[in-house]
From Swiss-Prot:
Belongs to the MinE family. This is Cell division topological specificity factor. Prevents the cell division inhibition by proteins MinC and MinD at internal division sites while permitting inhibition at polar sites. This ensures cell division at the proper site by restricting the formation of a division septum at the midpoint of the long axis of the cell. The keyword DNA-binding does not apply. InterPro entries: MinE, MinE_sf. Pfam families: MinE. HAMAP family: MinE.
Amino acid sequence: MTLRDLINKLLGRETSSANTARERLQLVLAHDRVDMSSLTTDLLDKMRKEILDVVAKYVEIDFEEVAVSLETEDRMTALVANLPIKRTLTGEIEFKKNHDNPKKK
């Protein structure tokens, strides 16, 4: 159910079949634009590594429990990343930032 459908339902309006058909067609077209065959194992591994590199700058990750996968449901494909966080590194980031760039007096 889209936000528009929810608003229409709350206001007592019925969704026309034309609008429903248009929304379904938009979903199909969006799905067709994504060429899933181009997402090779090598590309997924590269994406996984880059995502982990970025997230690891800010939090400590339990790398043994990381899971990255492609999930398809109702004509929609999602890249799902489950990254268990051990702790945040914000204090260490601030410390490094202050000591790497000392203010001149």
